[in-house]
Amino acid sequence: MEKIVFRKIVFVAFLLSLSCLLEGEARMSGDVTIQRGGSCNNDNTCHDTCPGCRITQCIFRQCVCTRCNTPRSSLRIESHM
């Protein structure tokens, strides 16, 4: 009985450490953008919705775009004088 409890604790600790590792990796990459604007059926659809991204994938019908060169937004300042 004690061995089963110990194995479960070790397994949960392993899953928790794996989760933390993956979260830290995602934070360090910093260039992952998940498109939420619509569903996708294949990777080509994601390529069209993620212009400027080197890698586009359709995962679980959701676009995942990585290594994106986001264009700088052109801000116009209007003065009301």
From Swiss-Prot:
Coiled-coil ranges (or none): none
One GO cellular component term: extracellular region
> Between which residues do disulfide bridges form?
C40-C58, C46-C63, C50-C65
Q: Where does this protein chiefly localize?
A: secreted
Q: Which GO terms describe its molecular function?
A: mRNA binding
Claim: Iron is one of the keywords in the record: no
Biological process (GO) annotations?
A: defense response to fungus; killing of cells of another organism
Cell compartments where the protein resides: Secreted
Domain of life of the native organism: Eukaryota
Q: What are the protein's UniProt keywords?
A: Antimicrobial, Disulfide bond, Fungicide, Plant defense, Secreted, Signal
- Extract the signal peptide range: 1-26
**Keyword Disulfide bond applies:** yes
Spell out the family assignment given in the record's similarity comment: Belongs to the DEFL family.
By what name is this protein known?
Answer: Defensin-like protein 266
